[in-house]
Design a protein with these regions (language model features):
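Conserved short beta-strand elements that form part of the metal-binding/catalytic scaffold
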Residues: 33-66, 113-118
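Vicinal oxygen chelate
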Residues: 20, 71-113
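Short glycine/proline-centered loop/turn elements that form peptide/ligand docking sites
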Residues: 40-44, 96, 123-124
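Residue-level hotspots at or immediately adjacent to binding/recognition sites across diverse folds
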Residues: 13, 21-24, 32, 48, ...
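N-terminal beta-strand motif that seeds the catalytic metal site of vicinal oxygen chelate
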Residues: 1-25, 52, 67-69, 119-149
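Tryptophan-centric aromatic hotspots in well-structured domains and transmembrane helices
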Residues: 13-14, 27, 32-38, 102, ...
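Short beta-strand micro-motifs in enzyme catalytic cores
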Residues: 12, 43-45, 67-69, 100-104
């Protein structure tokens, strides 16, 4: 889910669930020239086609083979409330993707299964340490003393 500068409510990730992920990966490489990056700790492979959205490939366990589209949400809990109040159903509640964000899976009233994705807040840049701030103050003082001579 890299490079997700899309706006909320956009499709930002496509996930393929395959009964034979190695065969699917070979097929997509051979036909479309896609490159995959394996994420062994998640039993997952990421891909980035020539244009967005990118996606992932995983073994279809406890689910049929197919495609799951992820929609960017600013607030998954609020979006899930809207989904249920409009006749949809939560299939999988909000869960963390360590280091990336959160996701949840839902169905619309007709049975279409989709997912939500919420990014982790980006850490703020570190403020200057006291040592750096002291050096900066010393440089400014030195410059001003040169000017006053």
């Amino acid at each position: 889910m890299k490079n997700m500068a899309q706006k909320p409510n956009s499709i930002v990730h496509v996930e393929f669930h395959s009964n034979a992920p190695d065969k699917t990966k070979s097929f997509l490489k051979d036909v479309f020239g896609w490159k995959f990056e394996d994420v062994p700790e998640m039993n997952y492979s990421m891909f980035n086609p020539p244009s967005a959205p990118g996606g992932g490939l995983q073994r279809a366990e406890n689910m049929p083979a197919g495609v799951l589209d992820y929609i960017l949400s600013e607030d998954i809990e609020n979006t899930l409330r809207k989904i249920t109040s409009n006749g949809g159903a939560v299939v999988m509640p909000k869960q963390e993707i360590p280091g990336m964000g959160w996701f949840a899976v839902f169905q619309d009233p007709t049975g279409i299964t989709l997912a939500l994705y919420e990014t982790s807040p980006q850490p703020r840049p570190a403020r200057a340490t006291p040592k750096k701030a002291a050096k900066r103050t010393a440089r400014k003082a030195k410059k001003s003393s040169k000017r006053s001579r």
